[in-house]
Amino acid sequence: MADLVSVERLSKNYGPVKAVDDVSFGIQEGICFGLLGPNGAGKTTTIEMMEGIVTPDAGRVLFRGTPIGRDFKQKVGIQFQTTALPEFITVRETIELFSAFYPSPRKFDEVVALCSLEDILERDNRKLSGGQRQRMLLALAVLPRPEMVFLDEPTTGLDPQARRNFWDLIGRIKAERATILLTTHYMDEAQLLCDRVAIMDHGKILEIDSPQALLAKHFEGALIRLPYDGCCQDSLKDFKGMLIGDDFLELQTTGLDASLRDLIEAKIDLQGLSIHKPDLEDLFIKLTGSSLRT
């Protein structure tokens, strides 16, 4: 299947800082594609170049095989990290206002139901909670029935229940076969919603594939994780597959009982030990040695 969007060797510098460094990837139509990485990885600059907001120093973005131009903006919906809503008007009035900007917007009742706005239609924009505000911004992004929706860290700062409610809304957008580009710091979010993910750090793509394929490629068995204060470094050298972070130890093992015995015999303090199945955050730590939320 041909890619809906193709990113070809994008680069962007800000003075001496190489924010995006020769990045290439494709996004197939109808999938949710996750662009993951810590703050400063280059993902926001990448997404802004894809949206046509920032001009790349090198490379190009293709939409259906054609370089993006003015008409591209009519085919996408964007939910930015931060957006100022009109003050002193209600949610209902805001939807009606933005609907007037498009030749063929969704029907009012349709977008209200899609984004679960029924209970806040008469509320002033200034009085919206974080979760309500994000639902509202998503509604504005999907008003023109875009072929592609950009969601730049849409659940940052939301409480756990509001995040889960927003996931349901993204699921509804996916069900319409819209193509979604999602940036997020939350790995449970990416693992649940994304069909494919690209992991970025220092302006480069480290890995790209489905979450399941990436985890199968990099991990077998379980992960043992322990707090670490810098002691017993000589003992740790004997452990194959041991990752030593700033404040943690992580050991990948296919023989859990034997690994626990080895840790005890090495006189490693097991207080705070946890054992779990690897996830995307573990993969990022393995690739870069840093946490996704730093």
Each language-model region and where it sits:
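ABC-family P-loop ATPase nucleotide-binding domain
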Residues: M1-S11, S290-T294
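ABC transporter nucleotide-binding domains
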Residues: V5, K12-L182, M187-D195, I199-D201, ...
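ABC transporter nucleotide-binding domain
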Residues: D168-T254
